[in-house]
């Protein structure tokens, strides 16, 4: 049985400061700025594609100049969360995407700690280990927060 995408909103429904924009999206009431999307995806091989669809469906028009970079970085961070941030590839990954007129900020929260997240610079050829080097090259800023839940975040200027 496959797990569906589950969208969640962190905005409490009775709070009048937030205007609901659909499942998992909200915006400060009366403004055109910052947009937040919170989504939970299953920690399985589909997770990077599901995460990219969040950017496609929710925020692509605001990120036109850097949407490709944003999707590549998101794919790498989510793939790392599936591979290294879950127990035997089971569980969920939570995406928190904040977008305003100046930047995209994404948090990818995983079940295990993210304390040892760093790019690999091994001189020996190996089949992987380039994901965080790609993140470092394309994101304007990125980092990790220990957990659990652990979090890897990145920021891309719009």
Predicted regions and their residues:
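Conserved beta-strand-loop-beta-strand hairpin that lines the nucleotide-binding pocket
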Residues: 1-38, 82-158
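Conserved short strand/loop->alpha-helix "switch" segment adjacent to the catalytic nucleotide/phosphoryl-transfer site
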Residues: 52-75, 124
């Amino acid at each position: 049985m496959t797990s569906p995408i589950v969208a969640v909103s962190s905005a409490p429904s009775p709070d009048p400061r937030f205007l609901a924009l659909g499942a998992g999206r909200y915006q400060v009431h009366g403004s055109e700025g910052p947009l937040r999307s919170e989504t939970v995806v299953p920690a399985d091989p589909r997770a990077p594609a599901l995460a990219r669809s969040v950017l496609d469906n929710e925020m692509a028009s605001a990120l036109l100049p850097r949407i490709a970079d944003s999707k590549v970085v998101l794919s790498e961070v989510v793939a790392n969360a599936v591979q290294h941030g879950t127990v035997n590839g089971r569980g969920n990954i939570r995406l928190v995407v904040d977008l305003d007129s100046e930047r995209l900020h994404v948090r990818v929260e995983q079940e295990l700690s993210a304390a040892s997240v760093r790019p690999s610079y091994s001189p020996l050829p190996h089949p992987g280990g380039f994901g965080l080097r790609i993140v470092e090259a394309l994101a304007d800023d990125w980092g990790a927060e220990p957990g659990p839940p652990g979090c890897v975040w990145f920021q891309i200027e719009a």
